[in-house]
């Protein structure tokens, strides 16, 4: 019989329910977590045995949103969910990052976590619910896992921290921060902010970690009642004798190799040392496993780099702990793009472009939480040549999506409002060289490219990656880390922002025991580095260019009466389509009567504005217009007087004498002056050629609404 075990607890303004034992009983563990009608079903399956020769931990986290959760049917051709969206990929990474470091060293059994959103309240984002579910399922499973973790979203509204704000509250918040950690320590932070101070950001991290203890307590209570027996897994015994043999052959040579400052030369030398050491040892004893020897060599590498940093010696490339690598900043490097920049920091380089488009180019995202339009796009590409390798080139991988989102968060706070700058903006960062912190190089390059494109960003932004090496109470915070320092260190801490404050903060911690004091040191050191980089960037370009590129579309804005919108659009869009083709422009009309005309040629834009003004102009009784004969009938002629408006000249109003046959006086296409006699209630217009020719008044153009240009 089904025997569900349930735990409920209050979490800020929400009630959270954990339920297990009801569904997916063949999985290693399964939990249904709900938070005010948003429910996520999370399963964990772990293999009892590792695959032979497995030398890494194969953890897979899948996060999937089902449209039935929001009471909808998918809009795709096949009417079913397809490959993961960008949002789903980002949440899968959000779950993966804090749980991965909590599996023990040497555990290489395959583990898969699947989180499925099965019900959604539009006010409660499922990401925090999914993280809590993954933590609970892993803790229940008996798999070696040093959890549980808690997860919290922190907002900042009216100078107050808000725990797990609703979607409506987030719109008012200056901060959107997700923090995850164990009972003792913070493990992961992901955030975007409206240029907040270091102290405010750190306060949010501490607040979120304190508040999530209730989650950890609830999961521990559930595990006591429903947890499976802990696996009898033990790490392989350390072979001290073999470790000593490998160290005797390789340690001093690896120490020398890590004094080579050039990345490619260093890697080549390290590969030679490893290869020669493994060959020598396997020749002496053919029972030795090359993979095991490789792991021992990697541990020696890690120890060499870390011990030198902790001893206060220069880093791998000869820098001191707070030194930034050499910077090279260039703008306007590509002639036909709307904005471009080449940002180089040491052996990390990003070629970044900014492209301007119209509102029609904005991305419409059909998400579970509702449809939204994104007018700022940021794409990050990491080709294999950037690290001197060959590899597959194609659709973006999880890492590229994650790095692109982080870089976008770094720039978002300084982007202009749509009403001031009505363009869709796409930034693309091509990583041409990489040796640490390419996402932060993308932030710097994006700021430069946007200024080069004439986008009126509120301030320049720069990003920096910090690292940490910690042994016991001894620690060193490193500025502008290399790829090796990221890989061999204990923390990856990325901060982006302007001179005024922080716009994005991402933190991934691989060890427990990172204190508030260490985070404070890292944030303050990052601020110094950020200000240094901004100073160099400002020497290349210190303000947005006064005008956008000649190759970018210029958007002109005019306002028409809302009851005239139908006239400009026409039946089935016929008028606006014809206008677009005739003028060579892009025309967009909003519900409030705002008309945006985009054109790369100013004359085309002026022509389009004139045509719209003609269409929307009111016909004035008693006024004379230049018209064109469009139809001839027995009782008169129809004459177009501009703006798609047509009136009837009765046969009696053609001349000041009796007219027997209309075609004796008028021909199709003939231009004639006409006077407006009357516009009846149905909008029908009576015209007179006779009265127009009697008057000496010159022909008039329709009166036009005022226009304003938004560039």
Curated annotation (Swiss-Prot):
Domain KH: 553-612
Keywords: Cytoplasm, Magnesium, Metal-binding, Nucleotidyltransferase, RNA-binding, Transferase
Top-level taxon of origin: Bacteria
Biological process according to GO: mRNA catabolic process; RNA processing
Reactions mediated catalytically: RNA(n+1) + phosphate = RNA(n) + a ribonucleoside 5'-diphosphate
Pfam family for this entry, one: RNase_PH_C
Region Disordered, residue ranges: 689-711
Role according to the record: Involved in mRNA degradation. Catalyzes the phosphorolysis of single-stranded polyribonucleotides processively in the 3'- to 5'-direction.
Similarity section: Belongs to the polyribonucleotide nucleotidyltransferase family.
Oligomer and partners: Component of the RNA degradosome, which is a multiprotein complex involved in RNA processing and mRNA degradation.
Protein name according to UniProt: Polyribonucleotide nucleotidyltransferase
Gene name, Swiss-Prot/TrEMBL: pnp
């Amino acid at each position: 019989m089904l025997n569900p075990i349930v735990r409920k607890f209050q979490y800020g303004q929400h009630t959270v329910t954990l339920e297990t034992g009801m569904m997916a009983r063949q999985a290693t563990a399964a939990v249904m977590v709900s938070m005010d009608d948003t429910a996520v079903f999370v399963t964990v399956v772990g293999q009892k045995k590792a695959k032979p020769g497995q030398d890494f931990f194969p953890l897979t986290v899948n996060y999937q949103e089902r449209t039935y959760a929001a009471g909808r049917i998918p809009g795709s051709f096949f009417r079913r969910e397809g490959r993961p969206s960008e949002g789903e990929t980002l949440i899968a990474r959000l779950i993966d990052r804090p749980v991965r470091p909590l599996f023990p060293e040497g555990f290489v059994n395959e583990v898969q976590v699947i989180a499925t959103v099965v019900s959604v309240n539009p006010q409660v984002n499922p990401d925090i619910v999914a993280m809590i579910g993954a933590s609970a399922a892993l803790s229940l499973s008996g798999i070696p896992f040093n959890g549980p973790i808690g997860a919290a979203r922190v907002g900042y509204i009216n100078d107050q921290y808000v725990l797990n704000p609703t979607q409506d509250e987030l719109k008012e918040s200056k901060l959107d921060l997700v923090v995850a950690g164990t009972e003792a320590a913070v493990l992961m932070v992901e955030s975007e902010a409206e240029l907040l101070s270091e102290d405010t950001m750190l306060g949010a991290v501490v607040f979120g970690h304190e508040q999530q203890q209730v989650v950890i307590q609830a999961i521990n209570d559930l595990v006591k009642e429903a947890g499976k027996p802990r696996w009898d897994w033990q790490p392989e015994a350390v072979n001290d004798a073999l470790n000593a043999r490998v160290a005797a052959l390789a340690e001093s040579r690896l120490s020398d190799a890590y004094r080579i400052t050039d990345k490619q030369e260093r890697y080549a030398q390290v590969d030679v040392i490893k290869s020669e050491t493994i060959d020598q040892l396997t020749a002496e004893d053919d029972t030795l496993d090359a993979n095991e020897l490789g792991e021992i060599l990697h541990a020696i590498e890690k120890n060499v780099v870390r011990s030198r940093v902790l001893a206060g010696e220069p880093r791998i490339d000869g820098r001191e702990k707070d030194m930034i690598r050499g910077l090279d900043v260039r703008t306007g490097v590509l002639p036909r793009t709307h904005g471009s920049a080449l940002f180089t920091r040491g052996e990390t380089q990003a070629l970044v472009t900014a492209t301007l488009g119209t509102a029609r180019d904005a991305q419409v995202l059909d998400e579970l939480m509702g449809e939204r339009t994104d007018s700022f796009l940021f794409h990050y590409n990491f080709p294999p040549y950037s690290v001197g390798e060959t590899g597959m080139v194609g659709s973006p991988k999880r890492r590229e999506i994650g790095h692109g989102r982080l870089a976008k968060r770094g720039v978002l706070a300084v982007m202009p409002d749509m009403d001031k700058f009505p363009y869709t903006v796409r930034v693309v960062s091509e990583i041409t060289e990489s040796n640490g912190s390419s996402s932060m190089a993308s932030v710097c390059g994006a700021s430069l490219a946007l200024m080069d494109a004439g986008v009126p960003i509120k301030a320049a932004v720069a990003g920096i990656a910090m690292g940490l090496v910690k042994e016991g109470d001894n620690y060193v915070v490193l500025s502008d880390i290399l790829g090796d320092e990221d890989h061999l260190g204990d923390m990856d801490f990325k901060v982006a922002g302007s001179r005024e404050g922080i716009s994005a903060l991402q933190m991934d911690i691989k060890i427990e025991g990172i204190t508030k004091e260490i985070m404070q040191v890292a944030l303050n050191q990052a601020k110094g580095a950020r200000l240094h980089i901004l100073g160099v960037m400002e020497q290349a370009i210190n303000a947005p260019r006064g005008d956008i590129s000649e190759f970018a579309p210029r958007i002109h804005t005019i306002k028409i009466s809302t009851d005239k919108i139908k006239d400009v659009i026409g039946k089935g869009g016929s008028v606006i389509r014809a206008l677009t083709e005739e003028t060579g422009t892009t025309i967009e009309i909003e519900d409030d009567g705002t008309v945006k005309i985009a054109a790369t040629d100013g004359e085309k834009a002026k022509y389009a504005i004139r045509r719209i003004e003609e269409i929307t102009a009111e016909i004035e009784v008693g006024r004379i217009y230049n018209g064109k004969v469009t139809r001839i009938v027995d009782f008169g002629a129809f004459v177009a007087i501009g703006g798609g408006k047509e009136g009837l000249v009765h046969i009696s109003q053609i001349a000041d004498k009796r007219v027997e046959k209309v075609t004796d006086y008028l021909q199709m296409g003939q231009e004639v002056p006409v006077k407006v006699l009357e516009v009846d209630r149905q909008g029908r217009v009576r015209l007179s050629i006779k009265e127009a020719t009697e008057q000496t008044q010159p022909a008039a153009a329709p009166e036009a609404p005022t226009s304003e240009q938004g560039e």
